[in-house]
Amino acid sequence: MLVGAATSSLLARRAAAESIAVPIRLQAELLAKMASYDRNFQARTGERVRTLLLTKLGDPESARAGAEMKTALASIPSIGGLPHDEELASYADAAALADICRARKVSILYVAPGFSQQVDTMREAVSELSLLTVGSLADYVPNGIVLGFDLVSGRSKLLVNLTQARRQQIDFRAEVLKLTRVYE
């Protein structure tokens, strides 16, 4: 009985730690706008934006968030002024993730909830790739995801990991960085 209570408590803490603060539809709108502030976006992307929505296998919240983001992005006419496609994928491991991003010429990688323990290895795997990593959770940004979203005093706040942005050849304009919380 005590083990069940401890497990239940642990799961409740994990769910609270990995809950999405900013609604996914708003995340999609902010992502579409932020892409246009990356000086390298069109050169990296080419004629069409390819977004990979990464979900955790066996995690219903992760799957729901990925599907919701796909629907939200599909309703937006352009990202960074370009047409776009979105694809859902389940995470296997960091090396496979990097291979998929290279093979599919991914410009944006959206990381759904459920990956707090894998963000460091994901960061290392995609550090050499020129792509914008976007986290569904604010906690992902200090650990190496380039762009994230938080709720501060009831308002959405953009978060940017500037060190990782430079590694991934993301060059946000200074005027937009003034509006974000920057991590270095």
Regions found by a protein language model. Name each.
Residues 2-184:
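Short hydrophobic alpha-helices and adjacent helix-cap/hinge residues
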